[in-house]
Amino acid sequence: MFSNKKYIGLIDKYCEKKILDDSSTIKICYILIGILIGTNMITLIYNFIFWENYITCNQKDKTFYCPKDWVGYNNVCYYFGNDEKNYNNASNYCKQLNSTLTNNNTNLVNLTKTLNLTKTYNHESNYWVNYSLIKNESVLLRNSGYYKKQKHVSLLYICSK
């Protein structure tokens, strides 16, 4: 039932020993391991030296984050006040939030585009915005236009930062 034949190649202690004793094969393995370790060391040193450039690049990426309850749009964060305030109180409240009333200097292509946000996140209404006018008047934003309004009138407001 069982054969006494020897199958060459399956178990051959002489060949196995010959491979392990071959010093040139071991030298090649050491050289390859040395190359791998060397490239890893060079990569680590390079990353350590140029780490500041890596951080700078990440800081320049266009991802921005807004605080809770703020809306991000076009690299600007907006806060839509849901209570009515007169112009001065709205402006002061925005300052407490480390922001300003949305203004014509905000990095927004067109301030009236915020109306789309007001419809999405609040409701269509009049909003105080900061715009250069004479002393006792300011501008309210409504229906894609600017309208003069007395500063003592209470309206909703939009802060930006």
Swiss-Prot record:
Positions annotated as glycosylated: 89, 98, 104, 110, 116, 130, 136
Taxonomy, superkingdom: Viruses
Keywords: Disulfide bond, Glycoprotein, Host endoplasmic reticulum, Host membrane, Host-virus interaction, Late protein, Membrane, Modulation of host cell apoptosis by virus, Signal-anchor, Transmembrane, Transmembrane helix
GO terms under cellular component: host cell endoplasmic reticulum membrane; membrane
InterPro entries: C-type_lectin-like/link_sf, C-type_lectin/matrix_domain, CTDL_fold
Subcellular location(s) per record: Host endoplasmic reticulum membrane
Subunit structure comment from the entry: Homodimer.
Family stated for the protein in its record: Belongs to the asfivirus lectin-like protein family.
Protein name: Lectin-like protein EP153R
Species whose genome carries this gene: African swine fever virus (isolate Tick/Malawi/Lil 20-1/1983) (ASFV)
Lineage, broadest ranks: Viruses, Varidnaviria, Bamfordvirae, Nucleocytoviricota, Pokkesviricetes
